[in-house]
Amino acid sequence: MKKKLGLGSGVAICVGLIVATSCLVSLGTGMGSIGRWFIIPLFAVMVLNWFIGISFAELNGLMPRVQGGTGQYLLAGMGPLPSLIGNLSAYVITEILSMTAEITLCGLVLKGLFLPHVDNRIISIIIMALFLVINLFGVDIFSKVQNIVVFLLIGSMVLIGLIGVCKLGISSNVVDYAANAPTFEQIGGFKGLCSYAALAFWLFIGVEFIIPVAKDLKNPRRDVLLSMTIGLVLLFFVQSILGIGMTNYVSLDILANDPAGTPHMTYATNLLGNAGRIWMG
């Protein structure tokens, strides 16, 4: 079979599974809880995930025909029981917690913006069915769709983040971050920063999902690790820019405890009014 996926598609796979509404909620919560200090655990977790990426790339090089990721690697190295536990913890539980939250939030946002009379559960099911159909057409069609979606998502997040960082939005809604910024002691020092590493981890989880499609890459020896590295660095900078922008237009207490549970939507509304709300939605 002809290998069809290049480096760009590999990066899109790494990033596309992470850049999502649930991650924006986690970003807003982290920034609201400890302010811009949240960028420090964000960076530390990015480095940790890079080491994880190196491990997966090495395992893929040793066993290039293995397609099952964590479960198959554990099966070869430690036996069936660790493999079962690894599959449950790395994929099943993670997908249940993250993807259900993501598809639910997507349905809620679309209902609030465009379809107020439609049940959000119906919207979520339709979106899930749409992606199921796209996947049934094969990895080539899936990669083309994902490349376009990821490019638009990243570009949109960078732009709306830069508008916030440069304070180019609605001037009356600008928040004086410096006046309310927590000090290092107020966030609990180094221990406090470490406690937010778990929250920051959700902003990078899933970059290793490129492993199951490594067989379809044109140059897997080069592109597996390079895709994960570029994806992690790209995510760190995009999320840092967007997080700083959030703190310029939304107070920290609202970011941390947004009444609607969507701090990114509050930020977009404060930044550009209803146009920002539609844009972020």
What spans do the regions from the language model cover?
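Membrane-interface "cap" regions at the ends of multi-pass membrane proteins
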Residues: 1-37, 43, 49-57, 65-67
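Hydrophobic, membrane-embedded alpha-helices of multi-pass small-molecule transporters
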Residues: 5-24, 182-249, 276-281
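Residue-level signature of transmembrane alpha-helical entry/exit and packing/kink sites
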Residues: 9-10, 38, 42, 83, ...
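Hydrophobic transmembrane alpha-helices that form the core helical bundles
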Residues: 29, 41, 50-128, 132-136, ...
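Juxtamembrane helix-boundary/capping and inter-helix hinge elements in multi-pass membrane proteins
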Residues: 33-36, 63-68, 76-82, 215-223, ...
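Selective recognition of specific alpha-helical transmembrane segments in multi-pass small-molecule
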Residues: 44-52, 56, 153-165, 225-253
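TM-loop-TM module centered on a large, flexible mid-protein loop between adjacent transmembrane helices
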Residues: 71-73, 79, 112, 229-281
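Membrane-interface loop-to-helix entry segments
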Residues: 107, 120-177, 201, 205, ...
